[in-house]
């Protein structure tokens, strides 16, 4: 018996020795987990100074463990969190590290995951992670997923060259770690950050099944090349009562467990032009809070078979997305584990990658003016002149004499033919406002007085009533002309200009403009739109469109003083000012709180200007929001009464007369200039809700601004703030 026992011990020792040798072989990174909150089936595959990365091979499930506080982030549903009420499809979805959809014929709803679908995964281990090569036999397609832990960041990438498909089925979408950092009902305290407008949060509390859907928005707005054209419905044939949702300006989202002091900011680095941000609170299909990026690889669309659209066929795109699909998770802990930490992390990321450069942040109130419009008159259209160059000089002189020492002014409707004679092909001003020479003199003369006048150029649209659009108009993927229609007065149909035609048109305009010795330009249209389109039998994706627009903006920025209207993040590096920064979100029902996230990222780098103050229903609250976000005020004014616009396309500008808002401009200028002098070019370091209705903004130069949205005076942290007011503490 003793001999048998000794022999058994020898066998066990030999097996342990073999196991130790295997784990020490080059390229083999599997290490048995030891942490109490790491299931035994997970093996450690990478480690940095701050984190350990664990992997469960069958489902490509990973766990991130913070080495300092021991907190973890799970990427798939753990057994102890399974409430047992989900069907097999959803259970498989939540247990899989990657989820795809497949397109077969005209159906794009097949779920493809690592649990319910036959697959083969082979792993190759690297110094800081692994590469998983995945093949789905049933659909005869596959891809590779590279996962690497670099310091405080987890990078997840599907290389473009690793994607393969065969004729039996196509890949529709790819969702990487769709449960990363999930939580069950209200088991965790915290929130999901979504880039809706300036920013919003969805709390991780129990939603009691109130919502049927969550946040699902395409990065950089919807793709007009695939969507059907619609006509605006106006109240009393005049007023647009439907507010468009805010666009996703930046490819980011986040999850934060505030009590555990761990979370992440996710940056969609590659493939973002064809990806959506998904953030679904518990109760939306399942009882788990989750956020992720969903990449579109191929779409189906409806193709008309004839010009009358009497016959159609649903088909998949002829080609797939050709781009890496990559998400970078910036891991945040301790004092950085909140949305302020997310904002700082994103700003530092942009700066480190040359995507955000410091512009002149000197304070200037923005006062825009409308030059000319058009209205129907018998057979022809006639000019409706609202503000001439002489009248602008008169108003400038009035403001200057009342202490407004600097100004930024965008001149709209300056071009021959008025505001909606687009695209603008050359520098030629409308004679009704004084002509080209008068506009040039206005810009150059007042620049010496620190009044910067920018000419507005809407470069996306083409007006078929005023210009030949035969060779310039965009056609959608289905080869039908892309038209924007409305029931407004005068002009009711516009086309998009082909991106490469836009490049040619803008090059000629900028050349003719700068030849006159002026170079202040406010660019719009192409700054907040990208789309797929067809041309001469070829299809062009949003990647192609964005690349063209980026080149256009970059080239113009080298030749002009360029300010951009609500630009997408990939254009921020070339913006000397950000026009029309949203101060809120789309106010979806599932959003619990709005935060000035984008403003926190950009403050101190790019001057930001609000939407127009004179069209705000609650000007007092809007003023406080601007102060809180570090955004400068904007006005859209005319010398003549706005009643003159009643029969023009600008009939919605119901209150613009300068005399009405003169005193407001002067007062806003004095107040915001004083605040800007205190904050200077400092960054926002923190944003906090210190009490109900009272917010605190801390700058990195030590300045603190308290904003009180309540009607009564409030004392917080030893500082008293009057009702509906703000206080700067240096």
PLM features: what roles do these ranges have?
Residues 16, 20-24:
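Hydrophobic core
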Residues 55-67, 245-250, 255-289, 462, ...:
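Active-site-proximal substrate-binding groove within the catalytic cores of carbohydrate-active enzymes
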Residues 35-355, 718, 722-723:
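N-terminal accessory beta-strand-rich subdomains and adjacent acidic, glycine-rich linkers
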Residues 328-368, 372, 376-408, 651-682:
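Terminal accessory/anchoring regions of large secretory-pathway or extracellular enzymes
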Residues 2-15:
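Bacterial N-terminal signal peptides that target proteins for export
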Residues 360-445, 449-504:
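Aromatic-lined carbohydrate-binding/catalytic grooves of carbohydrate-active enzymes
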Residues 406-408, 452-454, 519-522, 561-563:
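Structural preference for beta-strand elements that scaffold enzyme active sites
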Residues 24-37:
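Sec-dependent signal peptide cleavage junction
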């Amino acid at each position: 018996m003793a001999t048998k026992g000794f022999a058994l011990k020898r066998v066990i020792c030999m097996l342990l020795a073999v196991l130790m040798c295997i784990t020490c072989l080059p390229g083999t990174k599997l290490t048995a987990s030891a942490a109490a909150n790491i299931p035994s089936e997970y093996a450690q595959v990478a480690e940095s100074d701050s984190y350990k990365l664990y992997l469960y091979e069958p489902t490509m499930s990973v766990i991130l463990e913070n080495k300092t506080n021991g907190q973890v982030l799970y990427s798939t549903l753990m057994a102890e969190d399974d409430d047992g009420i989900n069907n097999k499809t959803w259970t498989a979805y939540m247990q899989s590290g990657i989820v795809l959809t497949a397109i077969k014929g005209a159906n794009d709803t097949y779920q493809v995951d690592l649990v319910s679908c036959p697959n083969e995964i082979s792993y190759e281990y690297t110094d800081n992670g692994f590469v998983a090569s995945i093949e789905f036999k049933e659909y005869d397609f596959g891809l590779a997923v590279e996962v690497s832990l670099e310091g405080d960041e987890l990078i997840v990438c599907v290389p473009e060259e690793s994607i393969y498909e065969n004729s039996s089925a196509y890949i529709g979408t790819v969702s990487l770690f769709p449960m990363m950092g999930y939580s069950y009902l209200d088991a965790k305290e915290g929130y999901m950050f979504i880039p809706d407008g300036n920013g919003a949060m969805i709390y991780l509390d129990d939603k009691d099944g109130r919502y049927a859907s969550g946040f699902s928005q395409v990065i950089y707005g919807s793709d007009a090349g695939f969507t059907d054209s619609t006509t605006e419905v106006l109240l009393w044939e005049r007023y647009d009562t439907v507010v468009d949702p805010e666009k996703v300006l930046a490819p980011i989202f986040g999850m934060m467990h505030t009590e555990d002091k761990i979370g992440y900011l996710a940056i969609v680095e590659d493939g973002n032009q064809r990806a959506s941000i998904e953030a679904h609170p518990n109760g939306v299909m399942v009882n788990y809070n989750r956020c992720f990026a969903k990449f579109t690889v191929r779409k189906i669309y409806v193709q008309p078979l004839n010009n009358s659209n009497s016959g159609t066929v649903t088909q998949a795109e002829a080609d797939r997305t050709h781009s890496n699909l990559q998400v970078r998770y910036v891991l945040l802990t301790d004092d950085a584990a909140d949305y302020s930490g997310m904002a700082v992390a994103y700003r530092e990321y942009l700066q480190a990658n040359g995507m955000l450069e410091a512009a002149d942040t000197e304070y200037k109130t923005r006062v825009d003016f409308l030059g000319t419009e058009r209205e129907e008159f018998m057979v022809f259209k006639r000019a409706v002149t609202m503000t001439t160059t002489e009248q602008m000089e008169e108003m400038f002189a009035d403001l200057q004499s009342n202490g407004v020492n600097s100004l930024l002014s965008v001149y709209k409707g300056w071009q021959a033919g008025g505001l909606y004679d687009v695209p603008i092909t050359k520098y030629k001003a409308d004679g009704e406002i004084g002509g080209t020479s008068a506009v040039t003199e206005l810009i150059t003369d007042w620049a010496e007085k620190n009044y910067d006048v920018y000419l507005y150029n809407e470069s996306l649209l083409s007006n078929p009533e005023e210009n030949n659009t035969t060779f310039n108009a965009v056609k959608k993927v289905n080869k039908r002309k892309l038209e924007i229609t409305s029931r407004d007065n005068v002009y009711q149909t516009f086309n998009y200009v082909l991106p490469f035609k836009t490049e040619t048109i803008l090059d000629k305009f900028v050349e003719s403009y700068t030849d006159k010795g002026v170079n202040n330009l406010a660019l719009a249209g192409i700054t907040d739109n990208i789309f797929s389109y067809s041309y001469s039998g070829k299809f062009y994706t949003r990647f192609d469109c964005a690349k063209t627009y980026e080149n256009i903006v970059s080239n113009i920025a080298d030749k002009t003083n360029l300010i951009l209207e609500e630009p997408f993040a990939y254009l921020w590096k070339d913006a000397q000012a950000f026009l029309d920064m949203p101060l809120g979100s789309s106010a979806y029902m599932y959003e619990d709180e709005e935060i000035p996230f984008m403003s926190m990222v950009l403050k101190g780098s790019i001057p930001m200007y609000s939407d127009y103050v004179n069209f705000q229903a609650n000007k007092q609250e809007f003023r406080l929001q601007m102060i809180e976000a570090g955004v400068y005020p904007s006005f859209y004014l005319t010398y003549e009464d706005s009643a003159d616009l009643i029969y023009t396309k600008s009939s919605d500008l119901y209150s613009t007369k300068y005399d009405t808002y003169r005193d407001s401009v002067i007062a806003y200028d004095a107040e915001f200039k004083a605040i800007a002098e205190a904050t200077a070019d400092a960054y926002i370091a923190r944003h906090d809700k210190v009490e109900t209705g009272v917010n605190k903004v801390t700058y990195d130069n030590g300045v603190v601004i308290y904003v009180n949205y309540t009607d009564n005076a409030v004392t917080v942290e030893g500082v008293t703030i009057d009702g509906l007011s703000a206080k700067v503490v240096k």
